[in-house]
Amino acid sequence: MTEVEKYIAQFEPSIQEKLHALRATFYDVLPHTQESIRYKMPAFTVGKHHLYFAAYKKHIGFYPVYGLTEIEHEIAPFRAPKTKDSLHFKLDKPLPLELIRKIILSKSLQMQ
């Protein structure tokens, strides 16, 4: 079991399902990415940079998400209060996987 799999396994099944879907989306968009745990959360390597996600009591956080003006209107509803670079996906709502796919692709192009 990888460190990311161990991270996901600590949560209840409904949250695990969302985290597995998010992880799979990273690999769909970036099949050669490498995953690790950094800052106590799953991290996916993009060039010399990383994209992260983490589960919390009421949401899944996704970081860093800035500089994507072309899709900001889609991202805005998920912007975390008082931050410029993180998104919060509420646990009681479906994950917007198509939007997450766009974000990963856009950030990967930006981070190369």
Segments and roles (model prediction):
Residues 1-112:
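Charge-dense, helix-prone N-terminal extensions
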